[in-house]
């Protein structure tokens, strides 16, 4: 029998990165999830994080983190610093990601 591993030991969380991992929990039937996706996409253009999408119905991670109210996101900086946000409404997703993720430095024509 294989030894069980903790969810934070998966490759998604152990791969070297500069920003946090943001896991979006969604389902095909979630009416509010498309708006959350658009908010995450908008913040991804200006802030540093790795974005992963999990189906809340089939995700063992969602089960382990007791995700019950969608839209939901996990913001994972480290084993000691992570937070699951659930039942997000309005601009909650944008507000959370702007607070949790650092701005990406972009060299453009205005630089």
Pin down the residues of each PLM region.
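Structural microenvironment flanking redox-active thiols in thiol-disulfide oxidoreductases
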Residues: 56-63, 99
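Short amphipathic alpha-helix with an adjacent loop that forms part of the alpha/beta core around
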Residues: 12-14, 61-65
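Local sequence-structure signature of Cys/Sec-based thiol-disulfide redox active-site neighborhoods
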Residues: 6-43
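N-terminal leader/targeting and pre-domain segments
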Residues: 1-21, 96-111
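Hydrophobic beta-strand anchors of alpha/beta hydrolase catalytic cores
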Residues: 22-23, 50, 73
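Non-catalytic, surface beta->alpha helical segment in thiol-disulfide oxidoreductase systems
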Residues: 75-111
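Structural micro-motif
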Residues: 65-76
């Amino acid at each position: 029998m294989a030894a069980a591993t903790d969810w934070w030991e998966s490759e998604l969380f152990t791969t070297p990165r500069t920003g946090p991992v943001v896991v979006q929990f969604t389902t095909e039937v979630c009416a509010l999830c498309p708006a959350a996706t658009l908010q995450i996409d908008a913040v991804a253009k200006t802030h540093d994080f790795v974005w992963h999408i999990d189906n809340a119905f089939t995700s063992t991670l969602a089960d382990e983190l007791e995700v019950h109210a969608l839209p939901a996101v996990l913001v994972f900086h480290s084993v000691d610093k992570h937070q699951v946000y659930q039942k997000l409404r309005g601009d909650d997703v944008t507000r959370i990601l702007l607070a949790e993720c650092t701005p990406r430095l972009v060299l453009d024509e205005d630089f």
